[in-house]
Every structure is written in structure tokens, then in C-alpha cells.
């Protein structure tokens, strides 16, 4: 699948998504866009619960991805600044009229750092 495409078949419809409640979790969603109502050029989501940290990125590849290098760095005691430098590792961001590949990589690092700091990671 590509950008703005789904893996659903022609005769399938997504009707529900269930996520477990994380009562003791902290989280942050950071996005960069031109105007508030625009799609994110790059977005970073961070969630933490009882020592576990999850990081996801949007618009850094053909589909949303987990930044597992960042998660592992946090798990091993790296600071938010150190871990966020790994945010774009392994990504193949699109280059389009909104942003080039290098700029998207820069945004991923900055937004991930902000998210880690805001969520207390």
C-alpha cells in the first residue's frame, strides 16, 4: 500500500479500533504543518507507561512507523535529546512540495525530542 491507501479489501470495512486504557501513562503528539487544519508534514506520537516507551512517526515512510531505535535508547537510559537523534533511522520519507527528505528527517528528530520531553521520558 502507498500513501493514503489502506490494506482493506474491496469488500472489507474497518468498524472499530480498541486500545487498552493506560491510566498511569503519559503521552504527547507533536506535528508540524503549515496551518492548524493542514495534514501533518511530519508527526510524532510518544506514550509511556510504567517504564515502557512507545514512539510512532507519521509521514516519514509510506505508512506510519514505530521508531524502535528511539524506544530502545530510552529503555537503555539515553536522554530525550540523545534518543531523538535516532528518530529518522531506517526511514525513507517522501520528498514533495511540502518538504524534502532531509527536512522531514530533521522534523522527526525535533518533534520526537519535544514529545519525549513533554511526556516526561
Short names for language-model regions:
Residues 1-121:
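C-terminal structural segment of proteins
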Amino acid at each position: 500500500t502507498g500513501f493514503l491507501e489502506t490494506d482493506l479489501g474491496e469488500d472489507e470495512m474497518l468498524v472499530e479500533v480498541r486500545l487498552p486504557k493506560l491510566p498511569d501513562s503519559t503521552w504527547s503528539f507533536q506535528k508540524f504543518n503549515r496551518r492548524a487544519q493542514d495534514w501533518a508534514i511530519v508527526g510524532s506520537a510518544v506514550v509511556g507507561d510504567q517504564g515502557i516507551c512507545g514512539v510512532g512517526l507519521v509521514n516519514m515512510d509510506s505508512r506510519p512507523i514505530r521508531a524502535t531505535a528511539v524506544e530502545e535508547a530510552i529503555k537503555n537510559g539515553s536522554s530525550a535529546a540523545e534518543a531523538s537523534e535516532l528518530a529518522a533511522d531506517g526511514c525513507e520519507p517522501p520528498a514533495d512540495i511540502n518538504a524534502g527528505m532531509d527536512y522531514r528527517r530533521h522534523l522527526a528528530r525535533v518533534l520526537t525530542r519535544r514529545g519525549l520531553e513533554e511526556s516526561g521520558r
